[in-house]
Structures are given as C-alpha cells and as structure tokens.
Amino acid sequence: GLVDKVILRSVKYAPCEGCNACHKNGVCIIEDDLIPLFDRILAMDALALASPIYTMGITAEMKGFLDRAQYLWARKYILKTQYFSREHIRGHKGVFISTAGTGWENVFSSAFPIMTAFFDIMCFDYYDNIIANDMDRHRGIRNHPTAIPEAREKGKKVVQVISALKGEG
C-alpha cells in the first residue's frame, strides 16, 4: 500500500481557537493545511502518530494538530453527522509511536488518553503503542536494545491484521 508521511513542523496550521463555530455546522473556520490532511486521514487504513515525550507530554505541534480535530468531534458527538460502522472502525488501525529520554515507567502515561480520544474521533481502532523509554541512557534509538526490533515486529503485525481484514492476507 501507499505510505503518506507528514512532518507536522512542515505543515502550515494554526491551533484551535475554541470558538465552537464547528458545533453549529461541523466545519472549522480556520482555513489552512489541516483540513485536507484530516480528509486524507479519514480515508486511510492505518494511522501512525509519532511524538517524542517532552516534559512528560507529547509535543506542542502534535497537541495542536490533535486539537484541531475538534470539528470532527463536533460532527460525531454533537451534530451526529459523522458515523462509521464497527466494521469500518475494526479495519482502521491507529498506532502511537514515541520515545522518551527518561527511564521512568510512567513517562508515556499522559499521552495514552490523548491518543485514545483522537483515534476515537477519527474512527480508528487504537491498535497498539510502539514506545521506548530510557533514550538518554542508551544514547539514542540505534543503541536501544529492543526499540527497533519491536517497532519492526509491531509494524508488520498491524499490516498483517489490516490485510487479513480486507481479505488480502
């Protein structure tokens, strides 16, 4: 399949203004690069969101991106105009990828509910996390003993699951 890689710092977008205009008609009043990006995401079979953990949370760029999906939340939960069947959601997998410098076990804990909410808004099954902490001690991902093999294995697995659901595997 096709892979569409987007680096958020290269995308021109503004944060959500909290104006709630989208609660009336399901349309975001901000016209920038995110609306077409969200349209592309809704058509994807899999979505991997990647953000390092800084100060116990995802990056500001990622949070700003996720918050802009508020208009889709409004469509789903206020206006009830965005609906996908359970079968559709089962066939659309979301994965969170992250690293953290510290070795603390709970370093990713603040990110998980945010990802859960976003994948729900986008009608994706939050399938898995590919996470590795203790990067400072290992001096980067390449020296981490399990990060790359685990990422490859989990990446293959999500592709296999989607292929099987589509009858391709």
How would you name each of these model-derived features?
Residues G1-A74, M135-G169:
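N-terminal beta1-alpha1-beta2 submodule of the flavodoxin-like/Rossmannoid cofactor-binding fold
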Residues L8, T99, A132:
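Active-site donor-binding loop signature of nucleotide-sugar glycosyltransferases
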Residues C16-C19, V95-F96, I131:
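Short, basic/glycine-rich phosphate-binding loops at helix/coil junctions
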Residues A74-Y127:
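Short, glycine-/small-residue-rich phosphate/pyrophosphate-handling segment
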Residues D128-D134:
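Beta-strand-loop-alpha "switch" segments that mediate conformational coupling across diverse proteins
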